[in-house]
């Protein structure tokens, strides 16, 4: 029962992140990085929900791959978990940058520098969501449930 509560809390935190990423009044992305023209274009082109969804998918997908696809005794150490975290921290902003660049290019806009700065917070959110996902789903892994910290 305790493990199910962890999963529910993880899902709730992730949904809250998505809601705060898409809201009009308080957008978590705009609170951490604000550039008037850049943020206006991202909002008008409805890019925030897609960026949030990509970040969530990469973070939860990375955790699922580690705990259920890899799930090996040879890879149940904290540094293997940290390596997957590193992959998530690199992959999420790269995919989001490619999406940003494609949408802006299709609309005749160039925000290269702003996009790179913006993706630094994607690194932060991807890492936080990966940790949340890890603690939410690790309990059902047969070999890696003790990673990154023992129970």
Go through the PLM ranges and name each one.
Residues 13-17, 62, 88-96, 125, ...:
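Alpha-helical transmembrane segments of multipass membrane proteins
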Residues 27-49, 93-121:
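Interfacial non-cytosolic loop connecting adjacent transmembrane helices
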Residues 6, 51-52, 80-88, 118, ...:
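Alpha-helical transmembrane segments of multi-pass membrane proteins, especially transporters
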Residues 49-77:
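Canonical alpha-helical transmembrane segments
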Residues 8-12, 65-69, 75-95:
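Transmembrane alpha-helical segments of multi-pass membrane proteins
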Residues 6-10, 14, 104-151:
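Alpha-helical membrane-associated segments of multi-pass integral membrane proteins
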Residues 1-59:
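N-terminal signal-anchor transmembrane alpha-helix
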Residues 18, 22-25, 66-71, 96, ...:
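Membrane-water interface at transmembrane helix exits
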